[in-house]
């Protein structure tokens, strides 16, 4: 995770839904910066620049904030996206220091093809991990290559990158490999079978 994600921010002095709407209309994202026992700071981020960083580095992106000339590293903790129009409505940012370990939820990506006749179900899309803020992985890969029916992959059995430890319950079921349901015959096939039986 790079710390080169420079993002300019300005301090917001207006609060409430009306102020947040005005911030978004101006092309910005209302955000709150908190952590390290400091008072929460209400910020305004450039929407396009922030969205570009999230697209490249994921929802746990570390930001190098320039708050009106003052530099501050921050971890993106949560992002609220409008369910229909898909713009960013709000963001929560956590103050971090170099070398500091943080806990974050990261996406689990399933790769590979399980054995024939199986169906892979992903029971958990994220797991919670602990790592240095600047070294948080964007995602954790889990391979199901040639996995047989009955294979279960728990959070505790996932190989994590060096320097990353599991914060989730080790027994959390992440991937389950089950038997694929039998294909139902098409209506035409059923009719043909019935006709064949009648002819006999």
From Swiss-Prot:
Protein name (Swiss-Prot/TrEMBL): Large ribosomal subunit protein bL25
Gene: rplY
Family matches, as NCBIfam families: bL25_bact_ctc, PRK05618.2-1
Any one GO molecular function term: 5S rRNA binding
An individual GO BP term: translation
Quaternary structure note: Part of the 50S ribosomal subunit; part of the 5S rRNA/L5/L18/L25 subcomplex. Contacts the 5S rRNA. Binds to the 5S rRNA independently of L5 and L18.
Role this protein plays: This is one of the proteins that binds to the 5S RNA in the ribosome where it forms part of the central protuberance.
CC annotations in GO: cytosolic large ribosomal subunit
Keywords (A to Z) from UniProt: Ribonucleoprotein, Ribosomal protein, RNA-binding, rRNA-binding
Record-stated family: Belongs to the bacterial ribosomal protein bL25 family. CTC subfamily.
Entry-linked Pfam families: Ribosomal_L25p, Ribosomal_TL5_C
């Amino acid at each position: 995770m790079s710390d080169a994600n420079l993002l300019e921010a300005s301090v917001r002095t207006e609060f409430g839904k009306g102020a947040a709407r005005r911030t978004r209309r101006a092309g910005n994202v209302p955000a709150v910066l908190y952590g390290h026992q400091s008072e929460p700071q209400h910020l305004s981020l450039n929407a396009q620049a922030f969205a570009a960083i999230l697209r490249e580095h994921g929802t746990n992106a570390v930001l190098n904030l320039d708050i009106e000339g003052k530099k501050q590293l921050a971890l993106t903790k949560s992002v609220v996206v409008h369910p229909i129009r898909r713009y960013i409505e709000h963001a929560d940012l956590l103050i971090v220091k170099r070398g500091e370990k943080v806990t974050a939820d990261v996406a689990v990506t399933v790769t590979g093809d399980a054995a024939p006749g199986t169906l892979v179900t992903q029971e958990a899309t994220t797991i919670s991990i602990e790592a240095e803020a600047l070294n948080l992985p964007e995602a954790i890969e889990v391979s199901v290559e040639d996995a047989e029916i009955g294979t279960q992959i728990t959070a505790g059995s996932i190989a994590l990158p060096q320097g990353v430890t599991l914060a989730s319950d080790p027994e959390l079921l992440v991937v389950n490999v089950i038997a694929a349901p039998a294909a139902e015959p098409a209506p035409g096939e059923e009719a043909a079978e019935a006709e064949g039986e009648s002819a006999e």
